Structures are given as structure tokens and as C-alpha cells.
């Protein structure tokens, strides 16, 4: 099995013929991703999950044989799967609110528009499903 997170998600897509490009805005903050295709390993089940993002590039076209598993307003391919052996997730389930706060302040203060940082920081206390998403990843790997 192969699991890609953030850049790894993008690398899987590009290596298999998908298209990855830099987009106009950064994807940062705890953003909801809608589950567009329920997979057997996605338990506990959710229709959408809140999860932290930190990216400027993203998958725009799926690789050959790929399918969209989740989508977000700012990121149409928030998660993808290829067959039953590859999973890519643009978001960061390893980020908790404290880590995201420190990272965003350290990386974006003074280098990016203040409104971008303020918006991301305003999402720190939004509903978060990082443990459930990490559980899905483990279930995916174990099922391969």
C-alpha cells in the first residue's frame, strides 16, 4: 500500500499521470472536506470532516485509474484513491489545533496577507475530525 499526505498526495497523482499545479491562494486552516465516495475503510462514517490544510499546490486532474474520495471548496481533489492500494490526502491529520496555530503564525506572519492568516486562525476551534481521518488511513493500509 502507498499513502501520500499533502506533497505525497500530489506526488502520487503526478507520478501516475495526473496534473498538479500551484493555485492562486494558499489552502490553510481547518476546512471541511465532503466525502464524495464512501469507501469500506471509512468508519466511523461522516458526510464531511474538518481537517487542517497547509498547501499552495494541489491536484487538478486525477491520475489514470484515480477516483475522488473527498472534495473541499478550496480543493476539488482533497483525497483520492487509485485501486485498492494507493491513497492520497491533501490535508494534514497530524496537525492538532496547537500545532496548526504555531505553524500558521510562524510561517505566514509578515510573509502573506494578514487576512489569510486571520482566516486560518479563526478556524482553529472549528469541528475537527483528524483522529477519524487518521483511523481511515490505517484501515486503508491494513486492508491492502
What are the roles of these predicted feature ranges?
Residues 21, 36-144:
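Amide-donor transfer/coupling interface in amidating biosynthetic enzymes
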Residues 1-39, 50:
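Cysteine-nucleophile active-site neighborhood
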